[in-house]
Amino acid sequence: MDETINSIAEYRLIPEYLEKISEEGKIWLARAMVSILIVDKQLVNEEKGFFKDAIMMIENDEIRGELIESIKKREIVELGELTTDREYAGHFYFLLAMVVAADGKVKNSEVNLLNSICGKLGFPAETSKQILNWVTNLVKLNKERDNITESLKDIKPVFVLK
């Protein structure tokens, strides 16, 4: 997928909602995001906004540095269990699935990491299957959206006068 103006329609973290998440929850989420971004050993343009989101939500410079280094080295960050912010755990998982879908492909390494993260979130294994089904559909819908918006560029306007 080429980098285009489609970025105006991408999903991002909303700063006002981040204020409700504990620092521990933000660190966990940022580490999970970075791990998903690099598990396939590449960082494409469509994923860079998520990397920025992950870095910017962290106030601790040492942890920010750890995340930046892990991207540079393409090494997954150690991720423990999410014990705080349980009310947001489902939202975190869907956000991580959107990170997987950002480049328009779902790779085996990403599937394996999402399965692992499911356990770290304390969810039953079938939750991972539901999320993977959803992310597969999201990738298909994003491709369909891209095809439609591409075809709409070539349509000459037809205005109906009243």
What are these regions (language model features)?
Residues M1-K162:
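Small-residue-enriched hydrophobic alpha-helices in membranes
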